[in-house]
Amino acid sequence: AGVATISGGNLERCRAQGKLVNLEMRLEQQPLNGMIGIGHTRWATHGAPTERNAHPHIVDGIAVVHNGIIENFAELKAELEATGADFETSTDSEVVAHLLAK
């Protein structure tokens, strides 16, 4: 699970593996500053259910959460990597953030 907020034009993100209560505990320890944000609880379809793969994905100031499957993500990822995109996760959803950042 994860959440991203915006404060003063900057994105902040907090993610945690497992149950939503894990994210809640992390946010209690390290609160985010923003008052507007997006969040997601993830059911892994591509990529392991790890903190690194948790949404939101952030690329160049764009935060993305996604529910669903991107069928052609391998092809899109390869095309983006060929143009210099650096992927942090093994999820299909991260391609959306990279495409929007282009």
Curated annotation (Swiss-Prot):
Subcellular location: Cytoplasm
Enzyme class (EC, first level): transferase
All copies of domain Glutamine amidotransferase type-2, residue ranges: 1-102
MF (Gene Ontology): glutamine-fructose-6-phosphate transaminase (isomerizing) activity
Domain of life: Bacteria
Other observations noted: The nucleotide sequence was reported in PubMed:1673458.
Originating species: Rhizobium leguminosarum bv. trifolii
Protein name stated in the entry: Glutamine--fructose-6-phosphate aminotransferase [isomerizing]
Catalyzed reaction equations: D-fructose 6-phosphate + L-glutamine = D-glucosamine 6-phosphate + L-glutamate
Function statement: Involved in the production of the root hair deformation (HAD) factor specifically on medicago.
The encoding gene: nodM
GO biological process, one term: UDP-N-acetylglucosamine metabolic process
InterPro entries cross-referenced by the UniProt entry: GATase_2_dom (IPR017932), Ntn_hydrolases_N (IPR029055)
